[in-house]
């Protein structure tokens, strides 16, 4: 099961592909104005997302996305409507409050800080890139919890 999480913003959108256990498979960032191009790529027979990838790889994607999780921030209403028009799978939205802070923690889990950086308090460590994709991963982790709760309550 491949899950796509999206953290839409005014100018750029973070995306993360995760498995059902929440493990990051691939993530990246695209300009929000390029959402049509992103979904065209998603619907292609072998999506690569190469120009947008920041982490991981889509090389071994051999199944379609079965769940989309969207962060419900500032620009999410219009974005969610667009996704509903394009997607053929279940879509859920989650609160994205503080996902940027969680993204910093996730960044340092993937990219262990060097010795000198480790000496700094976590709040003073500055990642070497923007983290919109990892905020989408944080959205995915929240969304998976919500999805499991919904499924459990249906039983």
What are these regions (language model features)?
Residues 1-6, 10-155:
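Phosphate- and other anionic-substrate recognition elements at nucleic-acid/protein interfaces
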């Amino acid at each position: 099961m491949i899950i796509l999480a999206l953290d839409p913003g005014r100018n750029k959108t973070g995306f993360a592909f995760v498995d059902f256990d929440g493990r990051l498979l691939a993530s990246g960032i695209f300009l929000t104005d390029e959402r049509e191009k992103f979904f065209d790529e998603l619907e292609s027979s072998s999506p690569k997302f190469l120009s947008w990838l920041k982490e991981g790889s889509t090389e071994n994607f051999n199944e379609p996305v079965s769940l989309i999780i969207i962060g419900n921030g500032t620009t999410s209403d219009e974005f969610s409507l667009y996704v509903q028009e394009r997607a053929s799978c279940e879509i859920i939205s989650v609160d994205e409050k503080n996902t940027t802070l969680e993204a910093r923690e996730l960044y340092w889990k993937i990219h262990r800080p060097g010795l000198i950086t480790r000496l700094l308090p976590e709040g003073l460590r500055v990642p070497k890139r923007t983290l919109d994709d990892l905020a989408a991963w944080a959205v995915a982790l929240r969304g998976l919890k919500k999805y499991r709760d919904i499924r459990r309550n249906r039983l």
